[in-house]
Amino acid sequence: VLLSGERTALNYLQRLSGIATYTHSVAKLLEGSETKLLDTRKTTPGMRIFEKYAVRIGGGCNHRYNLSDGVLLKDNHIDAAGGVKEAIAAAKAYAPFVRKIEVETENLDMVKEAVEAGADIIMLDNMTPEQMAEAIRVIDGRAETECSGNITKENIKTITSLGVDYVSSGALTHSAPILDISLKHLRVLEG
């Protein structure tokens, strides 16, 4: 029975073990900091629950499973609402009070607007470390901070040294190398 499902079982094992192993290697780089490593919703269709579990096993944290898990105002929401302040006001009017409101920002003007409008979490998206440092100074503890976009093993220590609360990376699930696992040495046990 095992051999009839060998390829499928190995595909799952290789993929999920690769995610857990890669996540662990990135999480080790955060040791000694207060920064939490988050995954994203960039997962394989039908595999989200398993891939997010692999991230947790590897030492990362899950951001959101789906859109109902939290309010994340992205550029298209901000544009549709007419600006950062308007998007936050609309979210506060309609979201349950227990939900944090996170805003994706791309520049310092957006960061300032998000702080003034009372965002709970401000995502610094695709910013340079210098831009992130300035944004963190502007935020000055008035909101939690999350850095995302172009996060690599090579630059993650620089980013966490800025004092960010969270670093999110889609690479944990969409770019983790698959582990080479086989059933080559499998033996039948008698009895």
Model-derived features with residue positions:
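Acidic/glycine-rich phosphate/pyrophosphate-binding loops and surrounding catalytic core
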Residues: V1-A117, I121, E130-V138, E144-C147, ...
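Positively charged, low-complexity, intrinsically disordered RNA-binding extensions
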Residues: M127
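Cys/His-rich Zn2+-binding cysteine-cluster or related metal-binding knuckle/ribbon modules and their
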Residues: K153
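Short, charged, intrinsically disordered terminal tails
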Residues: A171-G191
